[in-house]
């Protein structure tokens, strides 16, 4: 995980929802919503993770 006061560098799709668009872009939260809402209905959604905008900004610095 991250140190106190820092934000995470990556988030698993099952941790994401549409409220996370500002942290991980648009497509990743959609995949998170699909995993959360459709996996139990038998829809196969591959698990994965998203790098955060915080991680991207650290990389640029």
UniProtKB/Swiss-Prot annotation:
Pfam name, any one: PPDK_N
GO biological process, one term: gluconeogenesis
InterPro entries xref list: ATP_grasp_subdomain_1 (IPR013815), PEP_synth (IPR006319), PPDK_AMP/ATP-bd (IPR002192)
Coiled coil: none
Pathway listed: Carbohydrate biosynthesis; gluconeogenesis
Alphabetized UniProt keyword annotations: ATP-binding, Kinase, Magnesium, Metal-binding, Nucleotide-binding, Phosphoprotein, Transferase
Record EC number: 2.7.9.2
Cofactors: Mg(2+)
GO MF annotation: an example: pyruvate, water dikinase activity
Enzyme type, top EC level: transferase
Catalysed transformations (reactions): pyruvate + ATP + H2O = phosphoenolpyruvate + AMP + phosphate + 2 H(+)
Family to which the UniProt record says this protein belongs: Belongs to the PEP-utilizing enzyme family.
Record's miscellaneous remark: The reaction takes place in three steps, mediated by a phosphocarrier histidine residue located on the surface of the central domain. The two first partial reactions are catalyzed at an active site located on the N-terminal domain, and the third partial reaction is catalyzed at an active site located on the C-terminal domain. For catalytic turnover, the central domain swivels from the concave surface of the N-terminal domain to that of the C-terminal domain.
Domain comment as written in the entry: The N-terminal domain contains the ATP/Pi binding site, the central domain the pyrophosphate/phosphate carrier histidine, and the C-terminal domain the pyruvate binding site.
Function: Catalyzes the phosphorylation of pyruvate to phosphoenolpyruvate.
Name used for this protein in its record: Phosphoenolpyruvate synthase
């Amino acid at each position: 995980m991250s140190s106190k006061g820092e934000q995470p560098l990556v988030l698993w799709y099952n941790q994401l929802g549409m409220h996370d668009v500002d942290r991980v872009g648009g497509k990743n939260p959609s995949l998170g919503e699909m995993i959360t809402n459709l996996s139990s209905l038998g829809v196969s959604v591959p698990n994965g993770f998203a790098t955060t905008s915080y991680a991207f900004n650290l990389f640029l610095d």
